[in-house]
Design a protein with these regions (language model features):
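Short hydrophobic/charged patches on amphipathic alpha-helices used for structural packing
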Residues: 262-266
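Non-catalytic positions within long, well-ordered alpha-helices that form the structural scaffold/packing
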Residues: 269-272
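Short, low-complexity, intrinsically disordered N-terminal peptides in bacterial proteins
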Residues: 1-3, 315-318
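FabD-like malonyl-/acyl-CoA
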Residues: 1-147, 275-305
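Alpha/beta catalytic cores of group-transfer enzymes, especially the acyltransferase/condensing modules
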Residues: 11-12, 37-42, 105-257
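Short, charged, surface-exposed secondary-structure boundary motifs
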Residues: 307-313
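Short, solvent-exposed amphipathic alpha-helical segments in soluble enzyme
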Residues: 23, 152-154, 189-190, 286, ...
Length: 318
């Protein structure tokens, strides 16, 4: 068995996430406590937002990003408590989930990652005024077709619209100015594809995020990542980091660049991975992975029951 640990991104959050694991596993509780200390200036502890809400506060990007990190790393801590000998061959995360992967790899301390994600979330939210940007999921068209339609819509409107997430075959999320995204959706319909708006607070992973990338770059300049204990596959190119010297570059590029999740999954499969463990709220990545590789073995861990199921399956696997 060759295992990959994968970590979700924004959109997976829900009130109550991590609460049951933290109540049952001291190792998980310690993760939330550490993130609360890292963000000690918060008027309400981040763990309280995760466990109790309100949803309006949890879904603010500046809170969502460190909250999903905390929950994902808490799930990892609980899994390690149950199966300390289970060693992943490779790690990856979707968008902000890449920070969770870097924590799991030993490259970033948890407290540093939490503060970086607070800054990242704040900067991404502030990069574009409310209502100016939009995102839309395009279904049923090949990646290169969607890229071409984005280019057409951008030329026709003189505005920004780009492929932002290559999630799985037949699903690409685009981001940019709201009017350019609307034009893209018209072009998608003309080509026989479907599209739907993605309810987000800003157009992530497109050129409109360049101001946020610059702010993150300044923060990362002051950080010296540790060597990676486990390989991490980067979102921006679907290739392993290689070494910690690229952490700053790759995380900065990721803010305004596309998340190439399909390529990340293919890279892990090509590295011999036959089992994926999704650590964090929801099961979004499990669905995407199975669309990249039909029949892929994926175990999602988000609460004590799903942890029990994953431990049982992983313990029985050859």
């Amino acid at each position: 068995m060759r295992v990959a640990f994968v970590f979700p991104g924004q959109g997976a959050q829900e009130v109550g996430m991590g609460r049951a694991l933290a109540g049952q596993y001291p190792e998980a509780r310690a993760v939330f406590d550490a993130v609360d200390r890292a963000l000690a200036a918060d008027p309400v502890p981040l763990s309280t937002l995760c466990f109790e809400g309100p949803a309006e506060a949890l879904t603010l990007t500046a809170n969502t990003q460190p909250a999903i990190l905390a929950t994902s790393v808490a799930c990892l801590a609980a899994l390690r408590a149950r199966l300390p000998s289970l060693a992943p061959a490779v790690l990856a995360g979707h968008s902000l989930g890449e920070y969770s992967a870097l924590v799991a790899s030993g490259a970033l301390p948890l407290d540093v990652a939490a503060r970086l994600l607070r800054l990242r979330g704040t900067a991404m939210q502030e990069a574009v005024p409310p209502g100016v940007g939009a995102m839309a999921a395009v279904i049923g068209l090949d990646d290169d077709v969607v890229v071409g339609l984005c280019e057409e819509a951008a030329r026709e409107t003189g505005r920004v619209v780009q492929a932002a997430n290559f999630n799985c075959p037949g699903q690409v999320v685009a981001a940019g100015h709201a009017d350019a995204v609307a034009r893209l959706r018209e072009r998608v319909a003309e080509r026989g594809g479907k599209s739907m708006p993605v309810q987000v607070s800003a157009p992530f992973h497109c050129a409109l995020m360049e101001p946020a990338a610059a702010r993150l770059d300044a923060a990362l300049a002051a950080i010296s990542p540790s060597p990676l204990d486990v390989s991490v596959v980067a979102n921006v190119d679907g290739a392993p980091y290689g070494d910690a010297s690229r952490v700053r570059e790759l995380l900065v590029r990721q803010v305004a660049g596309a998340v190439r999740w399909s390529d990340c999954v293919r890279a892990m499969l090509e590295a011999g991975v036959d089992t994926f463990v999704e650590l964090g709220p929801g099961r979004v990545l499990a669905g995407l992975i199975k669309r990249v590789q039909r029949g892929a073995r994926v175990h999602s861990v988000s609460d004590p029951a799903s942890l029990d199921a994953a431990v049982a399956a992983l313990s029985e696997a050859p």
